[in-house]
């Protein structure tokens, strides 16, 4: 179901909608007339307020329970225009101004964890990745990801108190759990695109093309089952759980990419597969 927003004056894209504690929605908004900005959507008043303009946002934003918004932006070096780094940014949505943690370069996927902690992914230009954890029990703890594995998303689940990552390697793409011993596979590798990983109450939410188009999926960590949650005409993206029964997401219509809500119903089980369905591909004859 579409979220009510002010009628766009031109082609507009909303992305990464996030629920706040008071029932409002934070989303990243872009159009052809203005720079990208985070906006606060009030669905009751049917109003929208800009929080702050942004630069080139490099990975999905995340909101902590205390109301602090985290994201990363690509920033050029003041000395060398061809040198670009992804820097960690944050702001308190009600009272603060956006700030940059300048010492943390090459940061991706900022993820709030327990007790006001924060974790993120760091990368080097040779293709190495590590997960940095800062919390009451850990201070600047680096977890090195084995070489040859790329990180494409990260989320923290409050029920299991673990970080989960989207990993790509020679075997395909899969979800892994970060443990003290290293990475442990949660799903089997497959040649499927997974995206925008989030987590809540023992369940992972993400986008998947297993059905042949981008749809919202969930993985139950207790049962090990995967479910398809949406069936949309042009695809759905950026899931973020409001509670046990409702998701925020992005979907597409004639106005552009718009925020929407999706009911959570664990009815359509997704069987493991190595490749997506050939829904959008033309029919071809098998070779002899």
Regions found by a protein language model. Give the residues of each.
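Outer-membrane beta-barrel initiation region
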Residues: 1-20, 29-30, 208, 257-258, ...
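A short beta-strand motif characteristic of beta-propeller blades
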Residues: 2-8, 47-52, 96-102, 139-145, ...
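A flexible loop/linker signature enriched in serine peptidases of the S9 family
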Residues: 9-12, 29-39, 52-59, 72-89, ...
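Short coil/turn segments that connect the beta-strands within blades of beta-propeller domains
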Residues: 22-24, 66-67, 115-116, 159-161, ...
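Short loop/turn segments that connect beta-strands within beta-propeller blades
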Residues: 42-46, 92-96, 134-138, 178-182, ...
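C-terminal, active-site-flanking charged/polar segments
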Residues: 224-280
């Amino acid at each position: 179901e579409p979220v009510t927003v002010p009628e766009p004056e031109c082609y507009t894209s909303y992305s990464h909608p996030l629920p706040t504690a008071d029932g409002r929605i934070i989303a990243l908004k872009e159009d052809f007339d203005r720079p990208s900005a985070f906006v606060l959507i009030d669905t009751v008043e049917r109003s929208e307020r800009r929080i702050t303009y942004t630069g080139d946002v490099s990975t999905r934003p995340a909101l902590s329970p205390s109301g602090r918004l985290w994201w990363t932006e690509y920033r050029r070096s003041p000395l060398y225009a061809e040198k670009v780094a992804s820097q960690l940014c944050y702001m308190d949505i009600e009272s603060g101004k956006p700030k940059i943690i300048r010492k943390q370069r090459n940061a991706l996927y900022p993820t709030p964890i327990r007790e006001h902690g924060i974790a993120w992914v760091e990368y080097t230009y040779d293709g190495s990745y590590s997960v940095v954890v800062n919390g009451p029990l850990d201070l600047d703890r680096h977890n090195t990801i084995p070489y040859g594995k790329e990180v494409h998303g990260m989320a923290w689940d409050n029920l299991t108190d673990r970080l989960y990552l989207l990993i790509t390697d020679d075997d395909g793409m899969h979800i892994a759990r970060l443990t003290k011993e290293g990475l442990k596979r949660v799903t089997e590798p497959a040649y499927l695109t997974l995206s925008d990983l989030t987590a809540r109450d023992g369940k992972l939410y993400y986008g998947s093309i297993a059905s042949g188009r981008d749809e919202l999926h969930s993985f139950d960590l207790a049962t090990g089952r995967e479910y398809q949650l949406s069936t949309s005409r042009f695809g759905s993206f950026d899931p973020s759980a409001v509670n046990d029964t409702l998701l925020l997401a992005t979907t597409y219509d004639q106005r552009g990419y718009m925020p929407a809500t999706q009911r959570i119903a664990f009815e359509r089980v997704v069987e493991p597969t190595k490749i997506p369905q050939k829904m959008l591909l033309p029919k071809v004859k098998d070779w002899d």
